[in-house]
């Protein structure tokens, strides 16, 4: 599973990049989506790599995102009680583990919004003009995306 977080706006952006961000449902800065690893999403990530931060996410990080930022239709928070009532899983952590293993999808939870609206990172970005490998905030974080997600919880 990949976590993709939009970090830059759309001013002076090429139309194909805007379209790809729209297809990924990354309509605003600090929005986060979780997608599966397949060639289609890898190609889409490659197109928007200069506007987003992305990396491989684990079950614990996904559970943290869902607990802090998971919203239902109507704006209510995602709770353990809602998960237990509307699915075969007993808690958010159990559901997140199933999603990370590929046994379930985020869309299996009725009413769960597909986009997580994150806060700006605590202590700020490292810089939005450079990639993560160059000391900035954009591009591929790999497994270290969890640190950025933790700052933006």
From Swiss-Prot:
One of its GO terms (molecular function) is structural constituent of ribosome. InterPro entries: Ribo_uL30_ferredoxin-like_sf, Ribosomal_uL30, Ribosomal_uL30_arc, Ribosomal_uL30_CS, Ribosomal_uL30_euk_arc, Ribosomal_uL30_ferredoxin-like. GO terms for cellular component: cytosolic large ribosomal subunit. Keywords: Ribonucleoprotein, Ribosomal protein. It holds the Pfam family Ribosomal_L30. The keyword Cytoplasm does not apply. SUPFAM superfamilies: Ribosomal protein L30p/L7e. GO terms for biological process: maturation of LSU-rRNA from tricistronic rRNA transcript (SSU-rRNA, 5.8S rRNA, LSU-rRNA); translation. HAMAP family: Ribosomal_uL30_A (MF_01371_A). Part of the 50S ribosomal subunit. Belongs to the universal ribosomal protein uL30 family. This is Large ribosomal subunit protein uL30. It comes from Methanocella arvoryzae (strain DSM 22066 / NBRC 105507 / MRE50).
